[in-house]
Amino acid sequence: MDFEKDLRAVETNIPGLIVFDLPVHGDNRGWFKENWQRAKQTALGLPDFGPVQNNISFNAKKGVTRGIHAEPWDKYISIAAGSVFGAWVDLRPGDSFGQVYTTVLDPSVYGQINVYGVTTKSERH
């Protein structure tokens, strides 16, 4: 696991989709990470938002497919253990329509993804 790195925001090819690379602090007891730190993350471009809902899911077996639904609010995604292959497609009309972003998320590499200001297909009707 990559310990003691700096917090950084990574822009993607989809406007409004930001990956936060989180510092993970470790020692002989295990590891600790700040999953959310408002002042630090808003300074790096995360809009100041109020979460609407907080969910946790657990997959008992490898290879489970889950989808993130297209609710019309910001999403802040965090991985607690293991890894996840994530894929995002921009369905908004405009220059970025059809752009795809994929990455493997885990607690130590790209631990957070913020999807903000992304209009869902259902909102266009």
Regions inferred by a protein language model and the residue ranges of each:
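Conserved metal-binding segment of the jelly-roll/cupin
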Residues: 103-125
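Non-catalytic, conserved peripheral segments adjacent to functional cores
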Residues: 1-110
